[in-house]
Each structure stands twice: as structure tokens, then as C-alpha cells.
Amino acid sequence: MTLARLFDKLRGNGRYATADDIRNVFGDYHNVLHWLADFLLGDSNFAESCIVDACTIAQTQGPMFHEWLVHWAARATVRCAFQTQQASVLELAREYGQGVDVEQKQSPVSVEHFQLLIENSDLIQARLDVLCRFVLVYRGIAKDSTTAVASQLGITASAVERAYENAINALDLLRQGAVRELMLPHYGHIYHESALAASID
């Protein structure tokens, strides 16, 4: 099963992570869905209930519908995960909405950032609050626009930009090898201390 159309905007131009990058890491779309749900929710057992598996439907359909279904399954899985965390996302968005404007707009994740995210997903998950994680998936991996992400999450574009900046900053710390700094609290924003402690152990 191909991941070429997993996200409709994941197309390679040499700067951003492509569908091929995702395919090379995960192997098939089942693994992508598991990683998405687990990264967003931080609980493997809880994540299972949010995975929308299109496999049985896909077996009886043609290639074009098959490709669309893979894309849909990924989007539906993320949406289901969001519904379980909506209250927390909205609460965090109010906090992020009170900050200063982001000076430089961030691009979708690079191939290097994508690889760092996958290789260090537990550490990044512990560093980022749930809003940052959803924004990282929608804006960074799926390459949705800031406006589209804001609409899907029901928050302001400025909150999306600040949350995404935090996510990219965390990936930059990893790229620079500043792992200990990555483990420290930052900006006063909320993040999961229990997950952080587990990642240090």
C-alpha cells in the first residue's frame, strides 16, 4: 500500500519532507496511523481507539479510490484524536493568543526536521504541549496553511503561528544537539511533565 497521497500537500520540492520520506520511515500506512495517534495523544492504548483503519474498505476498491482512502484515514485519525483533546487545545490557544506576534513565518518541516521528529518523538512529545503537537502535524507535516489549521482547530491564526514556532524551536534544539536544554521548561507554556520524566529515565 502506497503513501504517495497520504497527505494531499506532501509533494517533494527538495525543501520539505515528502511522501517518500514518510514511506521510507514507516513502511506502510498502518504504522503512520499508529504513530500519528500515539504522538498526538501520548497514550498508546488510548490512541488505538482513534485510529481509523481503511484497510478492509480499500481491499474491495480500485487504485484511485485506494489512494484517496489512505489520505482520508490519516485525516480522520487526526480529527478523532483532536476531538478527545479539543478542550485542552482551546484552553492552550487562549494562552498562545496573548503572546507577541511571530516575526518570521515558519515553513513546513524539512526532511531533516522530519527525521529528527520520528527518531526523537518521545522527547518531542514530552517537550510540546498538545496544541503544539497538533499544529506540528497539520502545519508541519500535512503542510496545511496557517489559516486552514486555525479553522480545523477552531483557534486563531496567531495561536497557530506561536504554537508552530515552539514546535520548530524544539526541533532546532535537537538539530543543534541541545538535548538537555530541550528537557527544560520553556516560555511558561504547559507541557506534559510525566512524559518528560519518562523520557529522561
Set out the residue ranges of the language-model regions.
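DNA-recognition helix of helix-turn-helix
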Residues: 147-189
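A short, charge-rich alpha-helical start-of-domain segment used by transcription regulators
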Residues: 2-35, 45, 59, 64
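Pre-recognition alpha-helix immediately N-terminal to the DNA-recognition helix
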Residues: 21, 32, 123, 133-134
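Internal acidic/polar
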Residues: 88-115, 188-196
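Short amphipathic alpha-helical boundary/capping segments
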Residues: 10-13, 109-113, 119-129, 156
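Short amphipathic alpha helix immediately N-terminal
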Residues: 125-148
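Σ70-family region 2.3-2.4 aromatic/basic alpha-helix that recognizes the −10 promoter
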Residues: 30, 48-101, 164, 168
